[in-house]
Curated annotation (Swiss-Prot):
Pfam families referenced in this protein's UniProt entry, alphabetically: ATP-synt_A
Quaternary assembly: F-type ATPases have 2 components, CF(1) - the catalytic core - and CF(0) - the membrane proton channel. CF(1) has five subunits: alpha(3), beta(3), gamma(1), delta(1), epsilon(1). CF(0) has four main subunits: a, b, b' and c.
Localization in the cell: Cellular thylakoid membrane
Membrane topology: Multi-pass membrane protein
HAMAP family: ATP_synth_a_bact (MF_01393)
Family: Belongs to the ATPase A chain family.
InterPro entries: ATP_syn_F0_a_bact/chloroplast, ATP_synth_F0_asu, ATP_synth_F0_asu_AS, F0_ATP_A_sf
Official protein name in the record: ATP synthase subunit a
GO cellular component: plasma membrane-derived thylakoid membrane; proton-transporting ATP synthase complex
Disulfide bonds: none
Length: 251
């Protein structure tokens, strides 16, 4: 009973999953292993980009061919969700989200982070840490605020009182709950996948975990696609001109 009460006396901010390697910078306490694996993912993406663009060929092959397919896929995704007139400036943002999440998710399954020993905690996919996914969600929020404001100016905030003024608090809450729901879904899926595979490897270390790992790779790719698609959809929604559409319908 005392242990139960002691658990609930712990502040929520101190609750955490597993142990962490902390870096103390002034009054800030950072999760060091998240920075290490994030830098690894960024390094992989930078090296792949340099390798693909260092010797560009008219008929692409190898890494150049792979990244050109990825770019076409991201362009189509952004065009479908944002619209043909507005999508081009947002391709880098949507592409960065998709590629970072995709490589982060797959790194947790394919890279043997567990073999690298740290003073505390252990390395894992960046997206298995709630700090990473919430940061991505907040970037998404800032992106569609900027998209709506740059397209409509102060008129963007008129959407918050449409169709009736008492919708204002609900619209404000919705702006933050949409990307945050994405962040918790991404965090939960990647963390659960790593935990399940880790337990199976301990119990049956040979071939049984392989189908689960393959399923984890598939769901990891789907989670990256969902996050990027909905981020693009939110940006497109913020720039959507309802008045212009109504005017065209009357004509």
């Amino acid at each position: 009973m005392l242990n139960f009460l002691n658990f609930y006396s712990v502040p929520l901010a101190e609750l955490e999953v597993g142990k962490h390697l902390y870096w103390q910078i002034g009054n800030l306490k950072l999760h060091g292993q998240v920075f290490l694996t994030s830098w690894f993912v960024i390094g992989v993406l930078v090296l792949a980009s340099v390798a693909a663009s260092s010797n560009v060929k008219r008929i692409p092959s190898g890494i150049q061919n792979l990244l050109e397919y990825a770019l076409e896929f991201i362009r189509d995704l952004a065009k479908n969700q944002i619209g043909e007139k507005e999508y081009r400036p947002w391709v880098p943002f949507v592409g960065t989200l998709f590629l970072f999440i995709f490589v982060s998710n797959w790194s947790g399954a394919l890279v043997p982070f567990k073999l690298i020993h740290l003073p505390e905690g252990e390395l894992a996919a960046p997206t298995s840490d709630i700090n990473t996914t919430v940061a991505l969600a907040l970037l998404t929020s800032l992106a569609y605020f900027y998209a709506g404001f740059s397209k409509k100016g102060l008129g963007y905030f008129g959407n918050y009182v449409q169709p009736v003024s008492f919708m204002l608090p609900f619209k404000i809450i919705e702006d933050f709950t949409k990307p945050l729901s994405l962040s918790f879904r991404l965090f939960g899926n990647i963390l659960a996948d790593e935990l399940v595979v880790g337990v199976l490897v301990l119990l049956v270390p040979l071939f049984v975990p392989l189908p689960v790992m393959a399923l984890g790779l598939f769901t990891s790719a789907i989670q990256a696609l969902i996050f990027a698609t909905l981020a693009a959809a939110y940006i497109g929604e913020a720039m959507e001109d309802h008045h212009g559409e109504e005017h065209e319908e009357h004509h």
